[in-house]
């Protein structure tokens, strides 16, 4: 691992206030690389200075890149929420969670503020006094719907310049000639009548006038047919068919007074995806999807809170730029206090009250009033952190009450489940979009080959990482395999580091050397012919126990806690598959024997990647040299600056951060780190359990494994009763009492 640069700017714990606030990390050039908020700054910031192995991989990269830390004290959590989002928008920090769209979504816009309103398709929501419908998933569907609506409601679609030109020349545009515009520019229709057409179009889009209007057209068609006006009847029939299609696309799914945004959520360790349905007046008016990379070890509740802040800050800012949050700051040294005025919603609330008064006076809703970006109700699958503060903030934005809740039953629960399913599918698409793209994968491998000076693209890449606690306890290593730039989890391996004396390696470099030595002395590495081992040769006896020369345990190919395949590699150079007894257990421990059953190691990698800089690369190169392997390239990816190191070079190779090659190396490195730290935590948990159980008579290794699988931790066992212990297979009353007594004495 690289040196810990956090000591250069670590503040005293007593200097950090135990108050709500927002903090900024800056790099060596003064750029803000991360903005965060905290209910208690002291508790939150001290977490960043705990041992590196306890931090999320991306958090490790962030704190090692940082060179200074600043914080700002605020009065309430709501103010920290506002200030954090404002700073994220201002500084665009590279390590912040940013929910991103995979595309720009189209909207149907109606310019309600103009004397002669117009309708058009747009991908922006920044105009005031404009009503927007959407977002829609496909722009061609929206344009098709608008084309059908214009045949029934021929309203203006031209820009202001085109409209004024037609007024001056007295000649309308082509749409007027084909019946898709009523030509208010040349006074073929009065302004009030044209506005009523716009209201009817909006009424169909909102679902308020769709079915009643179709029913009226149907009656008119029948009357025209009865009076033998067949051309009029045919025209009305076509209008009905076109409107039916539009109305079906905006089918009512709830009562007409329901205004809600329904969110779905899906996530894994590295990424999260969110899908939203927008329900207005009881109908689904649009949908949208976001995805985000997990920058640090943040839970789903905090992710959902961040999403709501970003979504509704953007929406409110687009529709009400004059009411954006105002922040007055006194930027001073570290720890400076800043005065904050939260989002000002007075103008927005006043507009809402005026609209409500106008509706009460006229006795009908103002169909052309801009739609509220914040609905009355927000349905989420996970209750967001700081829910009450968010509700208060959203209430100010909307100018009316807003509730956030998790739907438990009914139609809203069904729609939320549908949103969850869409989010899950989007997450899978996002994960596979780059790795499944043959062009991107080929480009990534070619970028790496060009940067490292390889003769051909590295079709098989193996990456190694070391994980341990302070002092070297529970040293483990991971090996992940990527073939054609795709993770091949069935060939992942995990190593328990023993060292020369069986007590572990003296440092990470020795552990890395041991790992690579053991890996490359397995199988047919020397003079590999590339031929796979026959399946019959891979079958071995499952009887008997492993001896002490072999690993303490084996993991089933699909039985580890992550669902990945692979096995543990432990002891003096032996890779142990499931149910295979080591035939070489009588051999002297210093002799590493070839194991022809190790078909997983029968293929050499084209490239070995290690997590670290020049020292780690030199250790890896030395291991390969000692194993007689001279045709495998080696490189290291250093976390802090994402520099690529190769053996015997004094300077690193710099790959473009946005290149496919860098993305591939980062993904390989991060996957290796994740796999290593997961195994390390598992070993620590087992070690803690065994240390507590070793002194209990009659409780050997097999019983310890059963207890671990049943209870999960020593803490849970200390809270268990004698009857709980008896539920474990093979634990009788006497052993249960012995366990209960021993654990409570400890």
Curated annotation (Swiss-Prot):
GO CC terms: cytoplasm; excinuclease repair complex
Gene3D superfamilies xref list: 5' to 3' exonuclease, C-terminal subdomain, GIY-YIG endonuclease, UVR domain, UvrC, RNAse H endonuclease domain
Keywords: Cytoplasm, DNA damage, DNA excision, DNA repair, Excision nuclease, SOS response
Compartments where located: Cytoplasm
Signal peptide extent: none
Superkingdom field: Bacteria
Ranges of residues in domain UVR: 211-246
GO biological process: nucleotide-excision repair; SOS response
Molecular function GO labels: DNA binding; excinuclease ABC activity
Ranges of residues in domain GIY-YIG: 18-97
Chain positions covered by the region annotation Disordered: 557-577
Assembly and binders: Interacts with UvrB in an incision complex.
Membership in a protein family: Belongs to the UvrC family.
Function: The UvrABC repair system catalyzes the recognition and processing of DNA lesions. UvrC both incises the 5' and 3' sides of the lesion. The N-terminal half is responsible for the 3' incision and the C-terminal half is responsible for the 5' incision.
Protein name as annotated: UvrABC system protein C
